[in-house]
Amino acid sequence: MAITSEIIGKLGGADVEVTPVSGTTSGSSGSEVILHTIEVPVGETWLVAVYGNLNGAYSDNYSSPQIYIGDTKLHQRATNGINSLAHIGTGTIEVKLRRNTGNGSDSFTGHVYAVKI
């Protein structure tokens, strides 16, 4: 997130959209919940970042949940606690929480930051 914070900080007066997000998913492996959707206007490219608290049923193996921004994903061995991820994209960009186990439930609470670059 340090790199993302530095980039956003250098954008100066740019309008950074900040959206609080929260979601929980349970069920089979592969189940997911969309935390936020960003519609990037045609001809524009945006930086989208997510920062927040990941709470997974498992956090020490390949069963830990993942955060996605578009096709960019958080490492599958992410630990519970504060995590961050950034993506540069166009078109429709979804921020999702995806399960990798069928046991328990996974949740995420944080913020999505989006800005035209």
Predicted features along the sequence, with ranges:
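Extracellular jelly-roll beta-sandwich "head" domains, especially the C-terminal globular C1q domain
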Residues: 4-117
